[in-house]
Amino acid sequence: MSLLDAGGLSLSGFCQPVRYDLSRFAARPDGMPREETWALAEALSGTIKTHVGYAVHKSESRGPASWATGDKVPVLQGDRQQVARAVAKTGRLPLKLDGISAEMRLPKDAARIFSALDGRRSLAEIGAGTGIDPVAFRTLWARLAPLSDWGLLHYSNLNRV
């Protein structure tokens, strides 16, 4: 953090924030600064070899991209159809990252969303194309959005149609 600070930058977020999530090990002590919680989670996990994050100029101070407006283009890492089939069949999505494991339980309707994640259409377009009620779609997407914490989902307009 001192290197960023010296360069006039601040950390906007980590590429895989789940690595720095202290709640995987213990409750965050009251008053503990976030930088210390990240360092403690890192020490407890023992799996972080390289830190990868997003830096912005201090004057910008913004967080990760928000999907709330619907204009973001989600990009899924991996084979979207394979993920869709697995979710349709089991309603579960196993998550693994350098010794960190979890399982996301999802309604089988989520498979339609995974199938539509082509890296070209915005969330609003995907929602309209799936035929899922807009309120239900947003509720369901809120359950999928944490995939970005695992490095399995990001937002990009590079391939936008």
What do the predicted segments below correspond to?
Residues C15, Y20-V56, G99-V161:
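Long, charge-rich, low-complexity alpha-helical segments
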Residues L9-Q16, R62-P64:
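Acidic/polar loop patches that form or flank catalytic/metal-binding clefts of enzymes
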Residues M1-L11:
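Short alpha-helix
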Residues E42-G99:
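Long, low-complexity, charged/polar intrinsically disordered regions in eukaryotic proteins
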